[in-house]
Amino acid sequence: MIPGRMNSREMRRLMAQMGIKSTEMDDVTKVIFKGKTKDYVIDNAQVTMIEAQGVKTFQVVGTMREVPKEPEEKKEESFPEDDIKLVMEQASVSREKAIEALKASGGEPAQAIMNLMQK
C-alpha cells in the first residue's frame, strides 16, 4: 500500500522498482486531438510519458479548448491522367465524358470504355 505522504523521490524509486519509467516531455507546448467533428486543443501542455510493460501512456495537463471543424466541401474525384487519356482515345469521347464514365465505373478504365461503347 502506498502511504498518504510520499515525496517525489520515493515515488520515482518505487516506480523504478516496478519497472515503470516516467519522462517529462519539456519540449511539448501544445497537444491536438483530431476528431471527426471537432478538434481538442490543449495549450500550455505539460506532457508526461509513462512506460510500463512496453506500453507508452501519455498524461497531458493544460488548458483545453474545442475547435469545431467546418464541413469540408466534397472533394472532386481525381483519376490518373493516363486512365482519362486511355478512355478518351479508346471510346472517342471528350475529357468530360471520360471522367464521367470513370466515376460511373468506380475508376476502372476498362469498364468505363465498355460502358461508353455500349451507348
From Swiss-Prot:
- SMART domains registered for this protein in UniProt: NAC
> What InterPro entries does this protein map onto?
NAC-like_UBA, NAC_A/B_dom_sf, NAC_arc, Nas_poly-pep-assoc_cplx_dom, UBA-like_sf
Q: Describe its function.
A: Contacts the emerging nascent chain on the ribosome.
GO MF term (any one): RNA binding
Q: What are the GO BP annotations of this UniProt entry?
A: protein transport
What is this protein's name?
A: Nascent polypeptide-associated complex protein
Name the species this protein comes from: Thermoplasma acidophilum (strain ATCC 25905 / DSM 1728 / JCM 9062 / NBRC 15155 / AMRC-C165)
Question: Any idea which UniProt keywords this protein has?
Answer: Protein transport, RNA-binding, Transport
What superkingdom does the record give? Archaea
Domain (NAC-A/B) ranges: 5-73
Under HAMAP family, the record lists: NAC_arch
Q: Which SUPFAM superfamilies match?
A: UBA-like
Q: How does it assemble?
A: Homodimer. Interacts with the ribosome. Binds ribosomal RNA.
Family per record: Belongs to the NAC-alpha family.
